[in-house]
Swiss-Prot record:
Binding partners and assembly: Monomer.
Homology family: Belongs to the IPP transferase family.
EC id: 2.5.1.75
Gene from which this protein is expressed: miaA
Described purpose of this protein according to its UniProt entry: Catalyzes the transfer of a dimethylallyl group onto the adenine at position 37 in tRNAs that read codons beginning with uridine, leading to the formation of N6-(dimethylallyl)adenosine (i(6)A).
Cofactor requirement: Mg(2+)
Site (Interaction with substrate tRNA): S100
UniProt protein name: tRNA dimethylallyltransferase
């Protein structure tokens, strides 16, 4: 099936102001935003996941922000199915914004996750790998998704890697299912890393991250559930939790190192993927004017796809 709806993908590493640009573009075009973020969907997570503000949510129609509890199941298949249902009712253009690239990839390449026939040769070959080997390979495709799943959840690791190996690169005669314009939000690491370090300080001190961790610990304990919930694997949450539980100072250097590792993977992914859309734009928050970038995108859309 080829869909008539068109997408504006706003992708890039964490900290490159994807949401800032997407929000501005959504207001100018009066279109909704589908959040392709692995953690913003959980209503209990706030301080560490950079959700849109209440003011922004009152001005822009967002999907997959605070939709479910950390105790609910959420996966690529859930996102894929729900996003397609939303797009059936959406206007001609919809923005998809987020750093969980497997989510974005599953949508534009129309993964049929519920109906797929198993490629037994590929699955059997991957099943011979140990958990660390599967984890390492998945990191090359989507570092954030690999971290979210964790090294010990073999079933989910294997499924995610299988999806990438099977569907991540389309066959030469396969056509994309959604037409899309892509905006790649990029920045030099030399400018991005200091910014991320400063943002981490703000998340810890201004947004009461530790207080949120204390609340999460209480509700998880009350339900007598394992602390190893998928939602709690969002970047920084384990480190903040361990520091709080052991009454120790937060080791910001460890969290910063994980941010840097994530960014390096996301930079490589963003450069190499989403290159077969109708038009590609780039946005560097440190150098480019967001208004001008939005106007260029809108001019292209109006002049080519009325």
């Amino acid at each position: 099936m080829i869909y008539s709806k068109r997408l504006i993908l706003v992708v890039g590493p964490t900290g490159t102001k994807k949401s800032y640009l997407a929000n501005m573009l959504a207001k100018k075009l009066n279109v909704p935003i589908i959040s392709a973020d692995a953690y913003q969907v959980y209503k209990e997570l706030n301080a560490g996941v950079n959700k849109p503000s209440e003011k922004t949510l009152s001005e822009i129609k967002y999907h997959f922000i605070s939709n479910i509890s950390i105790f609910d199941e959420w996966s690529i298949a859930h996102f894929n199915k729900r996003a397609k249902e939303i797009l059936e009712q959406a206007p001609d253009w919809t923005i998809v914004c987020g750093g969980s690239h497997l989510y974005v990839n599953s949508l534009i390449n129309d993964y049929q996750l519920e109906k797929q026939e198993l490629d037994t040769d590929l699955f059997d070959a991957l099943d011979k790998l140990d958990n660390q080997e599967i984890f390492n390979q998945l990191c090359e495709y989507d570092f954030q998704e690999a971290i979210k799943i964790g090294k010990n959840n073999r079933k989910r690791l294997l499924r995610a890697l299988y999806l990438f190996k099977k569907y991540g690169k389309k066959a030469k005669n396969d056509s994309k299912k959604f037409d899309y314009v892509v905006v790649k939000c990029m920045s030099d690491k030399e400018k991005l890393f200091p910014y991320l370090s400063k943002r981490l300080d703000e998340m810890i001190h201004d947004l009461n991250w530790t207080k949120e961790i204390e609340y999460l610990d209480k509700i998880i304990t009350d339900k007598k559930l394992d602390k190893e919930l998928i939602a709690m694997k969002a970047l920084g949450y384990k480190e903040i939790y361990d520091a709080w539980k052991n009454n120790q100072p937060i080791d910001k250097e460890i969290i910063n190192k994980k941010f840097k590792r994530l960014v390096k993977h996301q930079l490589t992914w963003t450069r190499n993927k989403f290159n077969d859309g109708m038009k590609q734009f780039t946005f560097n928050f440190f150098e480019d004017d967001a208004n001008r970038t939005c106007d260029e995108i809108i001019e292209y859309i109006k002049s080519n796809h009325d």
